Amino acid sequence: MISSNDFRTGTSIELDGSVWRVVEFLHVKPGKGSAFVRTKLKNAQTGSVVEKTFRAGETVPQAILDKRTMQHTYKEGEQFVFMDMETYEEVRLTEAQIGDRVKYLMEEMEVNVLFWNSQVIDVELPNTVVLEVTETDPGVKGDTATGGTKPAIVSTGAQVNVPLFISIGERIKIDTRTDTYLGRE
């Protein structure tokens, strides 16, 4: 059991026979009445997002997830194949199951795959990845008056805003959680 006061982004709970992940949470203490926690929950099986309010201190069952380190080995048709690094078992996931993080997924990348009742719930990528810039506009000397960013396409096809001095062929570090440029590699 977990208290609603302990909710954090990414916390997994069980409600109505399903696993829900906390996407957003806000502790509210109104001037009159008791405190409560307003949350946005994402259903791990269906992907639907709902808003739910809990009383402060209310306890709910915490989902016990099995986290396994797996390697993305290859893509076959519409499925991404992951191999367990210890047992060599393969798990196949669709792009819909992985979500928008698929844009940073590379072959031989190690990821954490979360299971609940032998069912894949989520895929956690590393917080940062290093990718090569494949397309971007050339930077013009002295063109930094507007804040200095331009769009760039990296080797996996993802689009990221980068500083003007970045050119094609450079390797850059990207935060996969916020889709932001962190620096050159």
Curated annotation (Swiss-Prot):
GO terms for molecular function: translation elongation factor activity. SUPFAM superfamilies: Nucleic acid-binding proteins, Translation proteins SH3-like domain. Its main location: cytoplasm. GO terms for biological process: peptide biosynthetic process. Gene3D superfamilies: 2.30.30.30, Nucleic acid-binding proteins. PROSITE patterns: EFP. SMART domains: EFP, Elong-fact-P_C. Keywords: Cytoplasm, Elongation factor, Protein biosynthesis. It is found in: Cytoplasm. One of its GO terms (cellular component) is cytoplasm. Pathway: Protein biosynthesis; polypeptide chain elongation. Pfam families: EFP, EFP_N, Elong-fact-P_C. Belongs to the elongation factor P family. Involved in peptide bond synthesis. Stimulates efficient translation and peptide-bond synthesis on native or reconstituted 70S ribosomes in vitro. Probably functions indirectly by altering the affinity of the ribosome for aminoacyl-tRNA, thus increasing their reactivity as acceptors for peptidyl transferase. This is Elongation factor P.
